[in-house]
Amino acid sequence: VVAITSAGQGRAGYAAADPAPAGAYTPPMSVHFIGAGPGAADLLTVRAVELLRRCPVCLYPGTYLDPEVLGHCAPATELIDTQRLDLDEITAHMVRATAAGREVARLCSGDPSLYSALTEQTRRLDAAGVPWDITPGVPAYAAAAALLGTELTVPEVAQSVVLTRTRARSTAMPETEALAGFARTRATLVLHLAITRIRQLAQELAADYGPGCPAAVVYRASQPDQIVLRGTLADIADRVEAAGLSRAAVILVGRALELGIDCAQSHLYDPVRDRSHLGG
């Protein structure tokens, strides 16, 4: 008997029990959506590495992935680069593999919860009756913040982080998610998929953040050719253009990025805070 949770719930729930009787329905193997992190092979989670070693099929985004990540796969793994495939073609590979009894690792840049086309792919898998699950990864903005040596939420400076992108050649933005609205909050702003519009964006954001607001651009964070640029909204576009960056970069804006910023102390660690109710 094999117990299967609903594919529509997104969990690959095979609970092994007694062997299935001859001729019984055998469910397809699972697809594992795996966050590949920002690129470095040693920034994958332990679970991600275990899945890559185990799965005989691996689909990966060749455009943004450090080839060393694929070194976690077994030598006999079938590797499929998805950068030139549409979603139907990608799904077809996954469905065929699972129907043949082969587990599939589907690598996603960064974390699958951000700009990974996860929803479109899982809907197709649900329609095909293929179970799937998700293994999170280190998002690109977190790797960028690490390289900058900064916290994005500094007490009494910024306690919110906005993760967004801008209107471009890609999917349209909802009307309620205009950049100007986010800028008015003056929260720490992280822009993905927007590096080609850096000059226009800097000008737009300066209206609320001010031209002297710290800004940074991190290209291919954690990878051998990574580039870190620091500046302000007044000059960050010049720095980006001088470096010739046109893709695979994250833009960060906000006072939390200010070097040596003077900030309040977190209440959580305030020495006068009453901790008598805490266990331990």
Residue ranges and their predicted role:
Residues 1-12:
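Extreme N-terminal basic, low-complexity initiation segments
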Residues 14, 24-25:
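Short, positively charged and aromatic/hydrophobic N-terminal segments
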Residues 27-138, 143, 237:
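Class I S-adenosyl-L-methionine
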Residues 29, 40, 111-185, 229-230:
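Class I SAM-dependent methyltransferase SAM-binding "motif I" and its flanking Rossmann-like core
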Residues 29-33, 89, 99-104, 123, ...:
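A contiguous loop/helix-start segment that scaffolds small-molecule binding in enzyme catalytic cores
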Residues 76-77, 150-155, 208, 232-235:
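Short, hinge-like loop/turn segments at secondary-structure boundaries
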